[in-house]
Amino acid sequence: MRALHVTLTYLILGAVFCFGQNSNRVITTGVPFLMITADARAAGMGELGVATSADNYSQHWNPAKYAFAENEKGVGLSYTPYLSKLVDDIFLGNITFYKKVDDRSSWATSLRYFSLGDIQFNEFIAGTIVDQGMERPSELTLDLSYALKLSNEFSMAVAGRFIYSDLKIAVDADTSSASSLGVDVAAFYQSQPFELSSNMAVFRSGVNISNIGPRLNYDSGAQKSFIPTNMRIGAGIDLFFDDANRLGFYTEFSKLLVPTPVAVYDSNKDFLGYRQPDIDFINGIITSFSDAPGGLGEELSEITTAIGLEYRFQESFSARTGFFNESQDKGSRRYLTMGAGFNLDFIEIDLSYLFSTSRVRNPLENTIRFSLSLNLDQSASQPSSKDSLDNSL
């Protein structure tokens, strides 16, 4: 593994926590790794998933989708290199498990681990470089969710999340690890198959408000950090041309529900910079819809947009593409994604690749992401999408 000098370390941390910033009012939060897409299926479709069909990684996007899962239980395993062009030991790992209790309800759990790699700290003393030791900062979350069908077409879910962030370094006695709790509230709609232009179709929509919880406190003398409370709203439609060919169109909108940074001045009215107001997370959520100094226009610029396409052939091969867009003043993340999936009986292998179209470099640019989905048991009570369509004809 590659050891990094302390000076370079802060550049990496800046990229991890504030990547893409080109405006002083870019919204930043603690534990931003919670917003990194872990599964290659969603990553290949412009990093969306709140209203796509249920899969093993629905825990991150919309746990209410598990109520519509076609398999009785499944496991998801994924590995995402981060800043791979700079270092080789920063990564996001994820494992997810779900199980259907019956045809109406299901539960799921997941573990997400983010490693910032080995970091070498040195200090220049009297013309000599003194070794201050090596650290391996990391963060993790442990989730548990429950989903319930309220009708044949609609479900809701709630998830609880334990968040732990260990970014403390031995050479800084003022810092410590931090922890918090988060809650997700999600809803999902999946229509019965219907006819559309001589083809059968299924419409889906979803909403998920995730990471609702208290702020993180790394230093008792400093301002606390908001966790990335986020709202996703999306919709999509699958068109079934025949028993073998299916094409899905999806779109999604997302907004961080944390305060917009505001200008801060000293007692002499000299400008000091931008900082988020020191308020609790509930007030932060409420004010996040109307606190932008630039008014409605700036509020709308805080909404990101993603569109995605997925083509499936005989449930054995998938091809995907998508586009993600963020305002230039709010981070300037813009990129095209592509991906593919291969279903080998009970194992599905997904791959994705990201092409940045922004002048701001993306930490995942030119990185191949992959994930595995293990479908452990086919449910007898939940028919496949093809069977559902056949039964409706």
Give each language-model segment a name:
Residues M1-N24, K255, L309:
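Bacterial Sec-dependent N-terminal signal peptides
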Residues Q21-L393:
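Subset of outer-membrane beta-barrel
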